[in-house]
């Protein structure tokens, strides 16, 4: 392959020497650069061969971006780049991705090429399409990064003069810096106490990196960066670490003394509630609870919503008292574990069955029936059975009817259904069976009159109702 490339370029070079109008033929120029771009991908490059190849080359400004290609080769001898610069390739042109050669060399940590480009006029303050200068690209070993910072600053890189798309300067954009690099950047004038356009400081941003470390946050705090500052959404660093799927206990321990665990962001979440929502282990939640003098109702409600009976027990041990409202909520959200925990601690809601029906949690209805909760709950004139009709849920209705509602409950059920003009069709068979099994029901004039009207209003006109006349 390399022999073919050399031969092609040699042929182009000879043709150029024979034809004084060679460069008026753009195809020849582009062909030469094409073969030179192929040579960039060849592993064993020879500088003398490269120089010979360049004899057939003139910068064309086409899409091969020869200088960019060679600046992006790791470990490349800077003399290759020097030859291209001498040949007339500009260090201040962008490729199709908006990158300058200096950005590319910075990204791959080739400081010798960085130095070569700078000495040939590369602009250290040029911005790529992400509005980043070369100072933003600080990967590599500490020594490599510090050397590159020194080079860029020496050739005029401006401090605190640019922000990228996220509103970050070079220091803030470095989400996982070493202490040595961080201090170096600060020593040349970068401001450490700045935030990005979302209000996040260095600790926020470090916590959002792939591998946040307590040691990094520790020295950031020693340099004066606030561990409790909220961003524009109200999230403190503790909010961020508590919201992660994998919790870093060392970081939580570090941030805990400086942050109120009940401090809410604009979405109503606190570090404590975020721990509960992400199903964190109880011992970790207990760690945060131990720093709080107040356990809010919101915390209890979230424990119930996420079925965290283990956390309810911890909260109870810390003196929080539960009541029927908590039991009601546990029923409404279908939290079987929390209902069981509260029931074991003699906390109940008399109308629990009614709220279970409203929520249509069949498992909860079954659990309450098993524990002998009454089906005769009446709330604002509505019964469990009338709500089954409203919800058109014959399955739950059948479960309730098997547990012997009282005659008064059935009377109130009919009243509620008629008042709200609900569809009677699903309950008519159940009421008929109820009356059949409870003959005393029709001996009560109030019940019987209501039942007769309930049925006759439902059946088509012209049907005889003499069966009802035998009672009174």
From Swiss-Prot:
Signal peptide: none annotated. ANK repeats lie at residues 97-126, 130-161, 233-263, 267-297, 322-351, 353-377. SMART domains: ANK. One of its GO terms (biological process) is symbiont-mediated perturbation of host apoptosis. GO terms for cellular component: host cell cytoplasm. Keywords: ANK repeat, Early protein, Host cytoplasm, Host-virus interaction, Modulation of host cell apoptosis by virus, Repeat. Induction: Expressed in the early phase of the viral replicative cycle. It is found in: Host cytoplasm. It holds the Pfam family Ank. Inhibits host apoptosis. Acts by associating with host apoptosome. May interact with host caspase-9-Apaf-1 complex. Belongs to the orthopoxvirus OPG037 protein family. This is Inhibitor of Apoptosis OPG037. It comes from Vaccinia virus (strain Copenhagen). The lineage of its organism: Viruses, Varidnaviria, Bamfordvirae, Nucleocytoviricota, Pokkesviricetes.
